[in-house]
Regions:
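Conserved small/polar residues in nucleotide/adenosyl-binding loops
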Residues: 112-116
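Divalent-cation
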Residues: 1-110
């Protein structure tokens, strides 16, 4: 699922990508992958790294792109003794765009629709 957010008076969802906006991608499918790599020219290696469930927090660069990988909490419904686990989220930036990619559906980015 792909969402385009533009900063006006808070984050406003747009129907299509605009320069200087934020593209939030959750559980990317083939269309999302193609959009990111072909339309936005995001390095494919960045998306592969984010897909690795064991990926550790770090930064990397390729060309004018910066990748920051963080780990965010997700509810663990399979083990009640360990209520939360963490999964990687990638924040990919260049001079015109911010892209966040997470291969898991989490609530961590769902608060972006709030007005600041």
């Amino acid at each position: 699922m792909r969402t385009y957010l533009y900063c006006e008076a808070g984050f406003v969802e747009k129907a299509q990508w605009l320069p200087n906006s934020w593209v939030n991608v959750v559980c990317p499918n083939n269309d999302d992958f193609e959009f990111l790599t072909k339309t936005l020219n995001v390095p494919e290696s960045f998306l592969d790294d984010i897909a690795d469930t064991d990926e550790r927090p770090r930064t990397d660069t390729e060309g004018n792109w910066l990748l920051t990988i963080l780990r965010i909490p997700v509810q663990n419904k399979q083990n009640e003794n360990l209520p939360f686990g963490t999964v990687p989220i990638g924040i990919i930036t260049n001079n015109e765009i911010i892209v966040s990619v997470c291969y898991y559906n989490t609530d961590s980015v769902s608060y972006t629709h709030l007005t600041l």
